[in-house]
């Protein structure tokens, strides 16, 4: 089982039947991987913005951001291999996030569900938490990624997702709704999304 030291990550009872057990500072958390690996993260060094006000959670304190960083580094060490293409890296991060987080039906205001902490540490998030978590994972594995918020013209003005760069092109990625590498035409047609594109890279249309 994994051994991660340096930060405390609480157990999520609702995940017990879905994942194998791993020990974190004497507490059990759950993972979809059963491969035995030992990881010590006393001082996580994975790349990303873990300062206060980060896109990973603008109001998360340094302790919560440190927990996010610990999980992100564990993901990178366990799942990302030398020589992987950006496509494989993004697909791995996408599947990891969808396997280790479920939708927070109670609302965004519970358990930091609109942050990367909710998605990666607590295991529950709404769309904003999924998007912020995906941004953190992509930053760590060296894949260009943007965090995007819908505008008032969208079918759901509160919705949030990502844009990722794969193979020299930008695509829409929405881990919460299982949208993987979509073109803008597909995204607009299927989800009715609208967003301000100023400052964002131009995505593939198909």
Regions found by a protein language model. Name each.
Residues 195-205:
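Short, low-complexity, Pro/Ser/Thr/Gly-rich segments in the mature regions of secreted, periplasmic
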């Amino acid at each position: 089982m994994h051994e991660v030291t340096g930060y405390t990550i609480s157990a999520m009872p609702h995940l017990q039947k879905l994942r194998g057990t791993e020990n974190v500072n004497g507490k059990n958390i759950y993972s979809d991987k059963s491969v035995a690996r030992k990881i010590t993260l006393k001082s996580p060094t994975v790349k990303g913005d873990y300062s206060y006000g980060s896109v990973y959670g603008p109001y998360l304190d340094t302790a919560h951001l440190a927990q996010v960083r610990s999980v992100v580094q564990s993901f990178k060490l366990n799942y990302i291999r030398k020589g992987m293409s950006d496509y494989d890296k993004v697909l791995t991060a996408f599947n990891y996030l969808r396997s280790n987080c479920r939708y927070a039906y109670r609302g965004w205001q519970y358990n930091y569900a609109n942050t990367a902490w909710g998605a990666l540490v607590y295991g529950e998030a709404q769309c904003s938490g999924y998007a912020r978590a995906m941004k953190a994972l992509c930053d760590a594995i060296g894949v260009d990624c943007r965090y995007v918020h819908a505008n008032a013209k969208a079918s759901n003005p509160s919705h949030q997702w990502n844009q990722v760069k794969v193979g020299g092109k930008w695509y829409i990625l929405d881990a919460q709704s299982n949208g993987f590498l979509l073109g803008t035409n597909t995204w607009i047609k299927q989800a009715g999304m609208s967003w301000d594109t100023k400052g964002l890279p131009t995505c593939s249309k198909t």
